[in-house]
Amino acid sequence: MTAAAPRVAAVDCGTNSIRLLVSEPSPEKGLAELTKQNSIVRLGQGVDETGRLNPEAIERTRKALAGYVETMQRLGVEKVRMVATSATRDAANKEDFFSMTAEVLGRVQPGARAEVISGEEEAALSFAGATADIEPDRGPFCVVDLGGGSTEFVVGKQAVSTQMGCVRLTERFMRSDPPTAAETDAARAYVRDTLRQVAPLLVSARTLVGCAGTFTTLSALTQGLDSYDPARIHMSELLFDDLTAITSALRAQTAEQRRANPVVHPGRADVIAAGSVIVEEIVDLARESAGLGSVVISEKDILDGIVAGLA
């Protein structure tokens, strides 16, 4: 009798959130999702300014990860991979964080601990996950993974990792609530300058694909959803003009007003205004350099790329 294939788990810890995906091999689907969870822990709080991880942020992350480990144990996970992205790449005291992850993840798989992955590997894993459900004839794809500290762009095997994300821009430029016009202009100038290195990638793209929380939240808002519904968000296609109408309205609101909307995660309400500036500049670049007019939103991303590599 053939033994059942092991259940696998992926954990992605970024600047703003830590997320879990548990999957098992399925004859029909290849990989069947058992659970997907998301917690806003703001691990990268202050890293852009201090160069160090805040001990309170590490503790918030530890508590969330311990909860994920309980879920993995309950579901019988045998293999886990945890990746840590922008915030830990930048931190002088990153070893405090890694020691914590080794202690917590070791309860599931001895020897497991978070890995810092390069921006290029992050982009490749995101690309594999984000494009899994899109018809191949819509390629070449440009996948944009907009995070808290960095944003990755990938077209095929070419990738660019940029030092701009919704937390980084909020802390560096957009500190008022709501942000002032001068703050927004400064953030926009930084994003526009950063995107110069991305322009050569975008020229060949036929479909723009957006993944991660800023894009998925903007999809829910653009569609006017009453609650966050992954099934309606995944593979939704947003016209640039509809999207930018929402982003400009978001920046006029306070964080508390954004938080009152049921589709906006409370932990994202204070940084999505900065995320909206990044989205607007990406949209302008995609329109100018590739003649595109819409973006496909994917609920699948780096987590799906990781579990595919484990199964």
Segments from the language model and where they lie:
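N-terminal basic/disordered segments at the start of proteins
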Residues: 2-32
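Helical "lid/coupling" subdomains associated with nucleotide-phosphate turnover
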Residues: 3-8, 22, 46-70, 74, ...
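A short acidic Gly-Thr/Ser loop motif
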Residues: 12-17, 144-150, 211-215, 300-302
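Generic beta-strand structural signal
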Residues: 13, 25, 146, 155-156
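Short acidic/polar active-site loop segments enriched in Thr and Asp
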Residues: 16, 78, 293
